[in-house]
Design a protein with these regions (language model features):
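Short hydrophobic/aromatic beta-strand or adjacent loop that forms the aromatic wall/cage
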Residues: 12-16, 133, 207
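Non-heme Fe(II)/2-oxoglutarate
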Residues: 1-102, 112-115, 119-123, 159
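Solvent-exposed residues in well-ordered beta-strands and their adjoining turns
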Residues: 22, 117, 137-139, 213-217
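Catalytic core of non-heme Fe(II) oxygenases with the double-stranded beta-helix
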Residues: 110-188, 198, 205-206
Length: 235
C-alpha cells in the first residue's frame, strides 16, 4: 500500500434515452409525412447543412406533440443524469442570476429534418448543434439477418445498416455502442455525442428517419405560457 495521500477521479460519458413513440405523436408525424408526400407542405433541401451522404434530406415541420415529447425527454435526461450536460455548458451562477431577473431557461426544438437513405448511403461519424439531438426511425427496410448474409465472416458483428455511438471509456480509449434501429423508436442524446449510420446493402427500398436538434434558450418569463421548470433546479 502507498503511504501517499491521493484522490481518485473517474471519467463519465453521457448516455442516451430511448422510447417507443406514443401513438398520438406517431399519428401526428404520419400526418406530416402524408402532407409532404402529397405536396401540401413545402420542404427545403438541407443536405448542405448536414453530414450525411444521402440522396435526400429535407426540412420537416415542427408539430406540437412531437415538440412536447422531445422537450419533456430533455428534462427527463437532466433529472436522470444530474444536469450533467447543462453544467458543462452553463455556469450555475449564470442560470441563477438570470432566473432571478425574470428569465426562463427552457428547451426548444428548432431544427427538424427527414432523411431518405438509399442502398449504400451513410452518415459518417459526426455531432450536431444544440444541447440535445434525436433520431426517430420511421422505416427500416431490412433486418440484421438480411444484412449479415452479405458479410457472413463478421460472425454476428456485422455493422451494415446499424446506428452507432462513439464515446470515451474510463481509461480514455474510444469505444462504441451499436443501437438497434426499430421502427417508431426514438433515441435522444447529447448533441456533442459522436454517432454514425452505416450503409445497408440487402434492399432497394428507402431507409427513412427523422432527426432534429433541441436548444436551451433564455426567454423572458412574461412571455412563457408554461411554468418555469428551472426555478427549483439551482444546482
Amino acid at each position: 500500500m502507498l503511504n501517499n495521500d491521493f484522490i481518485t477521479r473517474t471519467f463519465n460519458s453521457p448516455g442516451y434515452l430511448r422510447c417507443t413513440l406514443p401513438e398520438d405523436v406517431k399519428e401526428e408525424v404520419q400526418r406530416s409525412i402524408k402532407k409532404i408526400n402529397e405536396g401540401e407542405i413545402d420542404t427545403i433541401d438541407v443536405r448542405e447543412n448536414l453530414a450525411g451522404h444521402l440522396q435526400k434530406e429535407a426540412s420537416f415541420p415542427i408539430t406540437e406533440k412531437l415538440n412536447h415529447l422531445l422537450t419533456s425527454l430533455c428534462h427527463e435526461y437532466d433529472e436522470i443524469f444530474d444536469n450533467r450536460i447543462i453544467k458543462r455548458c452553463f455556469h450555475k451562477d449564470f442560470i441563477n442570476e438570470y432566473s432571478e431577473k425574470g428569465y426562463v431557461f427552457n428547451y426548444k426544438l428548432r431544427e427538424l429534418w427527414i432523411n431518405y437513405g438509399k442502398k449504400h448511403d451513410f452518415n459518417p461519424p459526426h455531432v450536431h448543434h444544440g444541447m440535445y439531438s434525436f433520431v426517430l426511425w420511421i422505416k427500416i427496410p431490412y433486418t440484421s439477418e438480411e444484412e449479415e448474409e452479405f458479410y457472413p465472416a463478421t460472425e454476428g458483428n456485422c455493422k451494415s445498416g446499424k446506428f452507432e455511438f462513439f464515446f470515451l471509456s474510463s481509461n480514455g480509449s474510444i469505444i462504441s455502442e451499436v443501437v438497434s434501429t426499430n421502427e417508431w423508436d426514438l433515441v435522444l442524446f447529447p448533441s456533442s455525442l459522436y454517432h454514425s449510420v452505416y450503409p445497408f446493402y440487402s434492399n432497394d427500398e428507402e431507409r427513412i428517419s427523422i432527426s432534429g436538434n433541441i436548444f436551451f434558450e433564455m426567454i423572458a418569463e412574461s412571455n412563457l405560457s408554461t411554468p418555469n421548470p428551472w426555478k427549483s433546479k439551482k444546482k
